[in-house]
Amino acid sequence: MFDIQYKQDIGIGQLKLGMTSDELENALLQMKKQWSNSSDEAMQMECCAETDDPNLITGRYMDNDLFFLVQYRNGKATEIVIQRDLSKVASIKLFGMDMFNTTAECIIDSLMKKDNVICNEKDLQLGTEYIFPEIGVRLWRERAFHPKLLKDPLYMEEMQAVLEDEYQYQYFQMITIIG
């Protein structure tokens, strides 16, 4: 299990904001050794500039099971992104909540008691991106799904063929730790 730390020492497990790429890569390899379900495959690591800003570098760390994305500014990690697949080998918790196995609605309601939320939709239950600036976390899902949509006949008609797949969008797919 890895807890998301906030305020002092913001990070996920041993991965901390403010680390250099070398420090973060070493910490990631140490964490990977702890995951009994993780493959023995070597982790691919690459860093590249994706914008015109020479001080902003994106690091990608991946193997068959896992994917991490890290933004570095001036050589220090400023964002750490983890995907849902990590929950196959580690439990990711914030304030005691399992961030990938608790519904988005429960997570949002709980975090709103601790911080203001910035959401890309007026209806908080149907947003895809949520930012909690004081806590230092951004939550994302590809599409929004809430059981209230099942009461909408037009939604039911349009989504009938893929309705079972839609249930996965009750959960977040990516969590970003931001400084």
What is the predicted function of each stretch?
Residues 1-52, 79-179:
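Non-cytosolic coordination micro-motifs
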Residues 50-73:
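Hydrophobic/aromatic-rich structural module bridging two neighboring secondary-structure elements via a short loop
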Residues 76:
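Polyanion/phosphate-binding surface patch
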